[in-house]
Amino acid sequence: MGIPGGEILQLPTPDVEGVFLKRLNRFAGVALIGGRESYVHIHDPGRLRELLFPGAKIWARRTVRGRTEYYLAAVELDDELVLVDSSLHNKIAVWLIENGYLLRGYSLEKREPAFGRGRFDLLLKSPEGRRALVEIKGVTLEVGGRALFPDAPTSRGARHMEELARAVAEGYEAHVIFLVLRKRAESMSPHWEMDRKFAESLLRAHKAGVKIHAVKLEMFKWGLRFSSELPVDLSPRDF
């Protein structure tokens, strides 16, 4: 899983590998690292059940964060590395935009702009000079070639979709970028079974003019490469 040729976004290099043992709560778990049990900070609040199971191989960085000694960076499956450090999502999206893989010609105006009842991830300026709000979501769940978001209910995510629709009504451009971090994904869909409220909010936002993007990225040791844009299917479905 070394880095191949092509444009690469370099990632922070983990210090250690280990074996995941159990999750304690949304942001902490226990792993066997260097022959002893250690606390690991998990930045991604999703359930990650398909990745963080007892015995899973993980990669982590040393850190000082309360009781946790390590910061979870990635999970290594049989033939796939999966990034689980959601603190990097904004950096990844900016890299995609600045390198022309997505929203070509747009420029970064501000990070974490305030709008309505909260903040979004990015404020961009379009080639025509319009303001564009951007919300970024990382996707680590893949089932049968379909990337699904979310893997846990997210009332905050649904609220963001409603606010983006309102932004369009007030003259902004608005975009949702799904960063698909699973190499077998061939399409992207909201996870209707897991969080119908979010899925319905995303569908309404799309109908209101919010633009939806899904970008697949391949992870290597230790970098990411753009793979492709994926088709997005917003239609309701049963699983």
Swiss-Prot record:
Q: Which domain of life is it from?
A: Archaea
State one molecular function term (GO). DNA binding
Please list which residues make up the signal peptide.
none
By its UniProt entry, which InterPro entries does this protein fall under?
Answer: SfsA, SfsA_C, SfsA_N
Name the Gene3D superfamilies for this protein: 2.40.50.580, 3.40.1350.60
HAMAP family given in the database record: SfsA
Q: Which family does it belong to?
A: Belongs to the SfsA family.
* Annotated protein name in UniProt: Sugar fermentation stimulation protein homolog
